[in-house]
């Protein structure tokens, strides 16, 4: 190509680019004008729980809505997102694309999507580059518009608000204790990342102890074994059987003294923090006609326990999600 051809090509490319930018800006202006008017435009292909009617309005997909409600309820029962995702896949529940593929991000996206409570926040993302069409998260660069009661809700606003508070509580818990997750396989090991040392404050780890007559599970302070010639934490090792027994004792003590706790819960029902009121109602329901626990109930641990502290001489302090504290001594 000679110099004249190259010049012509450059001019035409520039014109095409200007045209592309002009079209992009016009489209964005039109969309933002609709946003200002509160007109909601949502692609339901990747939006779980809703379909669209002939007029483009969001309508509930009954089968998907059942799954959404179950996800919200499970989360407030103390089930972590990875467990929720695994159970949905095990049951073969179709995701938004029709296949049983669920991830932690998918679950968290459903829990944090305000559209499930009937509202819509417009312009969460925007096109940063008209050439690449790359979408970026709107973190204050452009105005956002909150449309309330735009469509029928799948979950109540009260439940949605409580879930957001619980999400933040778990984030704060992990940050405060230096954790990356709330624990894996917590549906089988509910004490994971919930047991702390009452001497040095470190996390207790679950370990296998080998003896002549076999092996047993036990919990010990993470800072106990620091290496040769380095003195670790002096706290005792706790057999898992004793930890389970201690929780059963603590829970049964709550049931036995329910009337005393009831005054505490009733007062919390009017708390300005919706999560506090939710927990009070939850504990009242769990203990209403409950029979004494004979062996560890994993679901009760997941629903009720915030954390526990292990201290020397078999002392264990249990801290529950309603703010209650029960201390006891294990062993003979």
PLM region descriptions:
Residues 1-286, 296, 307-332:
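Conserved catalytic breakage-reunion loop centered on the nucleophilic residue
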Residues 292-293, 299-304:
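Phosphate-interacting basic helix/loop segments used at nucleotide- and nucleic-acid interfaces
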